[in-house]
Amino acid sequence: MAQSQEKPDVEQGGLERKMETRHLTMISLGGVIGTGLFLSSGYTIHQAGPLGAIIAYAIGSLLVYFIMLSLGELSVAMPYAGSFHLYAKRFIGPGTAFTIAVLYWLNWAVALASEFTAAGLLMQRWFPHSPAWIWSAAFIVVVFLLNILSVRLYGESEFWFASIKVFAIIAFIVIGLLAMFGAIPIAGYDHAPMFENFYSDGWLPNGVLPIFSTLLTVVFAFSGTEVVGVAAGETKDPSKAIPKAVHTTVLRLAIFFIGSIAVMAALIPWRKSGVDTSPFVLVFQSIGMPFAGDIMNFVVLTAVLSAANSGLYVCSRMVWSLAQEGMIPRKLAKTNFHGVPVFAVMFSMAGSLLALLSSVVAASTVYLALVAVSGLATLVVWASVSVCHLRFRHQWLAQGHTVGELKYRAPGYPFVPIVAIVMCVGALVLVICDPSQRSTLLYMIPFVALCYTGYYASVAWRAKRHGGQDDAQNALQSVPQDVSQPHREDGQED
């Protein structure tokens, strides 16, 4: 039996296939390249040392590559919008599917709130006497309009937002390399720095342990690449676009992140790196670039808006997908004539605004708990993707299909998903071992238990209310027996 049939322009449920490979690639890059690279990378260098930071980011890149390979195979075989929890529904269980969707939605809703706050603060560099909340409100309106009007507009806006960040990184790497090899003078050196900072205090000045202690920060810095899977259901010709986006995205991320870290580490003594000043600004100022602070403020502002743009998109598609499955009110799955799930967008924006409000009125209680829970969501999603990949391939072969029938097959199976699962579990172990991160589990475990309890209680209540299984329960439990069958949001098989 053939794999999922791809409709050229319309996805089941009213969404439209309007995004192309360039949109997918830039959306994935835009979801990752943000304040983690522009601001927090200095912390990694300071803790792990120059070589240690590169090793940590190389390990993170490898994990991302493995996750994206698995996601690529799943997304081509089953190009669903809001894919993660639908894969979990098919190959793990409906309760897990619901929990994953809620965690991932919460992760981006909280991130969205923090991005709006950051945008307002960044604008105060140029307008110091204006209230930050005015700028935050303006950016909220802009991001909302970009998402509510059409998916094509979202894709185009994210393409250009991400392009600015990519251009800034390329310029940084090129200028940094010229300074490293003496083509451009740089303050603090009367000779070409080359790789002097890498070995002047020893290859690993703080030892091996900091590589692993910073690895968790690095892994979270790469979160957002999986947005490709969320957008699969709105992509033209996913069997061609998704594999291309997967490989180009991972390659560019590795070059951008590791290349940037290498340049920073070569030009900035590791003891001077930190989170107080962006390492990008330090390098640009060292070579005498005028308005370095303003230029990077603009780039970081663009990064923040890009992350907010992607955040609202991801949140709304998760809500739309949950509604299509009957897990939450189906009204939230309604789309307008442009194929945009307007109620899902509004619901997600409202959720992020509540998170933003909690950061003001309950920063040490409610908001702290939200941040703690959302912080581990990426690892949970990544691990679930790898588990689903293993089970998908097993069922595919068990049902008489061959690997050759797959339109895209991830290389290195089953090594790739197994190693990815081990790495995700290892990252969770690091959380337990790190006293500063351990408290996140105190919030995470009860929240996950609450999601499972709430889901099964809801199913039982609806079944009792209707005197049997209602459509929500059917939608969650009627998984197609043949994994090659197209998914139907009404819970029925074709």
Language-model-derived ranges and their functions:
Residues 1-42, 46-51, 65-69, 81, ...:
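Membrane-interface "cap" regions at the ends of multi-pass membrane proteins
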Residues 3, 9-15, 54, 127-131, ...:
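Helix-loop-helix junctions that connect adjacent transmembrane segments
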Residues 17-124, 219-220, 225-228, 235, ...:
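Transmembrane helix-boundary motif of multi-pass solute transporters/channels
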Residues 55-56, 65-148, 153, 173, ...:
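Hydrophobic transmembrane alpha-helices that form the core helical bundles
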Residues 86-88, 93, 125, 201, ...:
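TM-loop-TM module centered on a large, flexible mid-protein loop between adjacent transmembrane helices
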Residues 120, 133-190, 222-223, 246-250, ...:
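Membrane-interface loop-to-helix entry segments
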Residues 160-161, 331-342, 382-434, 461, ...:
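C-terminal membrane-solvent junction of multi-pass transporters and transport-like membrane proteins
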Residues 180, 366-369, 373-381, 410-494:
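A generic transmembrane alpha-helix motif of multi-pass inner-membrane proteins
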